[in-house]
């Protein structure tokens, strides 16, 4: 499996992060919603040119439409980061003092490293604790785990092993967040079959065989916005 992993890393293009890591959207008359997104390569917008067409910009737009109020948003993300690295390197960079919603996308890199569930749970607890020191009441929403079993660039073996591991980490994340007040995990497992309604072939869901395309970012972000709306926390 290690040899297959090296071949995949060599074959997948090294794409840059998206540009424009902050923005303002919406024309509603309500109080401005302050949003930050935190995470790994998907939140960093790997696979699209700008964050406006990626996850964070689409999420902000969907929330603005859903709530009828403007949204100001900022991205704190880095490709390749595990939950532990996010806590150590990104959380100290957060400049905002007042935030209404925090959305976090993690799990892919911890799965690729085959980090054991106990280590993942500890990293997630540390991450939440670091955020709670700064934002004690702000809703924290963890997005779905990445659909690794659907990645076209991965071999069947890696899809099976790493894909099963990310699902295990998802169950661990659910276990950690369930008793925590105002902390939520969108546990729905992403499958391409769920998104076939947009009438696109499977390859169109990925920019490089691993990272999402603009289409996937936008479908995913709207789905997460719907989940946030159903939570009723805003």
Give the label of every model feature segment:
Residues 1-36, 65-67, 225-231:
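N-terminal secretory targeting modules
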Residues 1-15, 122, 150-165:
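Alpha-helical membrane-targeting segments
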Residues 32-36, 42-122:
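Conserved SGNH/GDSL esterase-like catalytic core that processes O-acyl groups on lipids
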Residues 83, 87, 121, 125, ...:
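Short, amphipathic alpha-helical "lid/cap" segments that border enzyme active or binding sites
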Residues 105, 143-144:
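Alpha/beta-hydrolase-fold catalytic nucleophile elbow
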Residues 124-129, 170:
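Generic structural signal for well-ordered alpha-helices
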Residues 135-139:
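A short helix->loop->beta-strand "cap" motif at the edges of active sites that frequently abuts
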Residues 148-234:
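Catalytic His-Asp segment of secreted/periplasmic serine-dependent ester chemistry enzymes
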């Amino acid at each position: 499996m290690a040899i297959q992993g090296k071949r995949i890393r060599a074959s997948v293009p090294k794409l840059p992060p998206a540009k424009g890591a902050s923005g303002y959207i919406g024309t509603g008359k309500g109080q401005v919603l302050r949003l930050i997104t935190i995470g790994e390569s998907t939140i960093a917008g790997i696979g699209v040119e700008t964050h406006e067409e990626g996850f964070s910009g689409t999420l902000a737009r969907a929330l603005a439409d859903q709530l009828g109020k403007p949204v100001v948003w900022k991205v704190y993300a880095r490709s390749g980061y595990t939950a532990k690295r996010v806590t150590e390197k990104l959380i100290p960079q957060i400049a905002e003092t007042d935030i209404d919603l925090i959305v976090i996308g993690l799990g892919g890199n911890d799965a690729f490293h085959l980090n054991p569930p106990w280590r993942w749970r500890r990293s997630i607890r540390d991450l939440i604790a670091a955020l709670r020191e700064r934002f004690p009441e702000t809703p924290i929403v963890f997005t779905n785990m990445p659909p690794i079993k659907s990645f076209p660039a991965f071999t069947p073996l890696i899809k099976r092993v790493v894909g099963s591991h990310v699902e295990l980490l998802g169950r661990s994340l659910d276990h950690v967040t369930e008793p925590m007040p105002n902390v939520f995990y969108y546990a729905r497992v992403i499958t391409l079959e769920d998104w076939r309604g947009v009438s696109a072939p499977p390859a169109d869901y990925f920019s490089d065989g691993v990272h999402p395309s603009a289409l996937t970012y936008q479908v995913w972000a709207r789905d997460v916005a719907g989940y946030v709306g159903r939570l009723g926390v805003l």
